[in-house]
Amino acid sequence: MTIDVVYPLGTGSAWNDNELRFSLRSLMRYVEDLGRIIIVGHKPSWLDVASVLHIPMADSKGGKDRNMIRKVLAACDHVSGPFVRMSDDQCVLRSMRFADLPAYGRRAERLGECPTKRWSRNKYHTQQWLAERGLSFHDFDLHCPMPCDPKIFRQMGEESVWQNEKCTINTLYGNMAGLIPHLGDILYYHSPPGCHRKIFSAVRGPMFLNYNNKGLDNRLRYALTVMFPDWSPAETADHSEVFDPNDWIYGRDSRPRIRPEQPQDKSRRRRRQASHASLRAIGPAGRRRLRARRGA
């Protein structure tokens, strides 16, 4: 039995929709029971609609989660059974089966007063709606792939909470479906991840990689091109488009954009050179004595 995947896709890509490209490559490489791929919303220029099902749908005003719910509801008529909802900025890092995918979440405490921040306020409205109906409240909005049942998702679509008030999609669905939260091994990059060596070391253990626009810097973009170099069937077969990671990392010009050296940079460079020259002059024994004095 295969499991379909649904991507609700908007137009807010920070990388010319290459987030979706590498997410699809990770599915093709690691998911053993991958079924149909359904993309609802924006269509990337490189997407091969002969290999995936694309359902056009424009975003409407009213919030990100509301648009995602609308798009997933449109996909429910085309899935073969239980499916997985994914975002374009999520990648699979190890071999797995979607049939065994748990609902990633955590037990959350009741919120008191309505928060002022938008995301927390959306969670508050979701929690209040669930509490009024005697439903449990677990936080499933951990930015992870989410297993879904189309029947329950349609039932959620009939409720007015997501149409009249802003809510969070995974927490609303997970508690209506009675899912048990599962804490898993997930790698998050919601801030610059650091050097390439740290990234390649960090991705060895977790099951999923999740990131946002702040975490998607040039180093992570390069790491994704190295981890998932093979084209997926979902990409267009037109090879006239040059596949050059440098074009994505540095823009249209493949040469790195280097800031001209400033006067303060020159003085720092001269101080480093002088320090290195003095260390070379004193020899190995002198360097050992210098390190010993600094340690003392």
Features from the language model and the residues they span:
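Active-site regions of enzymes building and remodeling cell-envelope glycoconjugates
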Residues: 47-67, 71-72, 98-106
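Active-site nucleotide-sugar/metal-binding loop of Leloir-type enzymes
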Residues: 70-82
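N-terminal anchoring/stem segment of glycosyltransferases
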Residues: 1-61, 207-220, 224-262
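Boundary detector for helix-to-coil junctions that initiate low-complexity/charged tails
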Residues: 89, 260-296
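Short catalytic/ligand-binding loop motif for oxyanion handling, primarily in non-cytosolic enzymes
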Residues: 14-16, 45-49, 91-96, 100-102, ...
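Short beta-strand-to-loop acidic/aromatic patch adjacent to the donor-nucleotide binding site
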Residues: 81-93
